[in-house]
Amino acid sequence: MPDFIALTRDVLEKGRSVRFQVWGSSMTPFIKDGDVITIVPVSAESDIGLGKVVAFLHPWLTGRRLVVHRVVGRRGSSFLIRPDHALGHDPFAYKLCDILGRVVRVEISGTHYSSRFRQGREEIDFHRR
């Protein structure tokens, strides 16, 4: 049986989106434990910009976990990425090949609504489910 990361990577490499429930508090209040996100594939550096929220393989966590954090800058050909909930921490640098996709939708428990997030951040659809 294929693991979640292999399956996610395979679907994204075929140009399809992936939707799954997240856990953890590193992106609160933007994305909370239990929210459902949709990520789309990225194929070029132009797909990833300042303020975008990306899903990437964290190389230092056990089992190279899939993690969702925000792009906060660039260093050469690397993207500087860090969680929203840890603004005091220095960002880590990741290459394009480490980034699997970009978050384009967040679903929150409850009734349906839609809005756009601005002020230098990725415009993402929010929906209550």
Give each language-model segment a name.
Residues 1-129:
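Extended hydrophobic leader/signal-anchor segments used for secretion and membrane insertion
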